[in-house]
């Protein structure tokens, strides 16, 4: 009598493990988000300035690697502050600025015009 053995083939594992596939997708999504943030910042859609309600930094000058003189507008006064890495000192108090001398606020950029100018610059019309 002859014995025959049946061979059972094991399913082969996919080329990449599920952990590697998920990791690759996550890295791709993060790279896409960073690229979109860079484009938004580069094209000028990001909000300008870091003014807080009632508080606005109107001027700033660097005196050294960690020292600055800053003019801050608060309600009815302008404060001249000395800012270092470890402390902030009030140097002087100025009267409020006149509204006439305030710089005009630029209107928000129009996406269509910005895209046209970008395409013209790159040579694609």
Swiss-Prot record:
Its main location: membrane. GO terms for cellular component: bacterial-type flagellum basal body; plasma membrane. It is found in: Cell membrane; Bacterial flagellum basal body. It comes from the Bacteria. Keywords: Bacterial flagellum, Cell membrane, Chemotaxis, Flagellar rotation, Membrane, Transmembrane, Transmembrane helix. It is a single-pass membrane protein. InterPro entries: Flagellar_biosynth_FliO, FliO/MopB. GO terms for biological process: archaeal or bacterial-type flagellum-dependent cell motility; bacterial-type flagellum organization; chemotaxis. Pfam families: FliO. The chain crosses the membrane at residues 20-40. Belongs to the FliO/MopB family. PANTHER family: FLAGELLAR PROTEIN FLIO. This is Flagellar protein FliO. The lineage of its organism: Bacteria, Pseudomonadati, Pseudomonadota, Gammaproteobacteria, Enterobacterales.
């Amino acid at each position: 009598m002859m014995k025959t053995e049946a061979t059972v083939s094991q399913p082969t594992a996919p080329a990449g493990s599920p952990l590697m596939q998920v990791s690759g997708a996550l890295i791709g999504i993060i790279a896409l988000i960073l690229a979109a943030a860079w484009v938004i910042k580069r094209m000028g859609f990001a909000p300008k300035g870091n003014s807080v309600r009632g508080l606005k930094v109107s001027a700033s000058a660097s005196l050294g690697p960690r020292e600055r003189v800053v003019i801050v507008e608060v309600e009815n006064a302008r404060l001249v502050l000395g800012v270092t890495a470890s402390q902030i000192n009030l140097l002087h108090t100025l009267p409020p600025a006149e509204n006439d001398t305030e710089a005009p606020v630029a209107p928000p950029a129009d996406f269509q015009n910005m895209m046209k100018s970008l395409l013209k610059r790159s040579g694609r019309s």
